[in-house]
From Swiss-Prot:
It catalyses: a 2'-deoxyribonucleoside 5'-diphosphate + ATP = a 2'-deoxyribonucleoside 5'-triphosphate + ADP; a ribonucleoside 5'-diphosphate + ATP = a ribonucleoside 5'-triphosphate + ADP. GO terms for biological process: CTP biosynthetic process; GTP biosynthetic process; UTP biosynthetic process. Gene3D superfamilies: Nucleoside diphosphate kinase-like domain. Keywords: ATP-binding, Cytoplasm, Kinase, Magnesium, Metal-binding, Nucleotide metabolism, Nucleotide-binding, Phosphoprotein, Transferase. It comes from Aeromonas hydrophila subsp. hydrophila (strain ATCC 7966 / DSM 30187 / BCRC 13018 / CCUG 14551 / JCM 1027 / KCTC 2358 / NCIMB 9240 / NCTC 8049). Major role in the synthesis of nucleoside triphosphates other than ATP. The ATP gamma phosphate is transferred to the NDP beta phosphate via a ping-pong mechanism, using a phosphorylated active-site intermediate. This is Nucleoside diphosphate kinase. Its EC number is 2.7.4.6. It is found in: Cytoplasm. Belongs to the NDK family. GO terms for molecular function: ATP binding; metal ion binding; nucleoside diphosphate kinase activity. Homotetramer.
Amino acid sequence: MAIERTFSIIKPDAVSKNLIGAIYNRFESAGLKVIAAKMLHMSSEQAAGFYAEHQGKPFYDGLVSFMTSGPVMIQVLEGEEAIRRHREIMGATNPKEALAGTLRACFAESIDRNAVHGSDAPASAAREIAYFFSDAEICPRG
């Protein structure tokens, strides 16, 4: 199996509920290592740029507004099949459809306030990691 990196956001709703540690525990229990992390309060420009692919969609303005409503925790995760594993841990985008025990089933409020974000493919992971982290900020743990 291939060692991959993926990008992850703990969104404002989960940060405000003090769920960072619980979510990190799930990542690490699944064999994913945090190799870069920082807390930030996204500016409108950062959020708009990050979610540029959704511009023009009905939910775009609300998404940018939500993602700038409070601090987020962003991280790079590394491990075997990290993208697939992370997406399994997160669960379906709509928490009503998420399997029991997934992050969204446990912690999400709604499809709009769904606790976490994760890259969906290697290309998006590379783009999203580079959007927020320089190479010098990433610390492989072997």
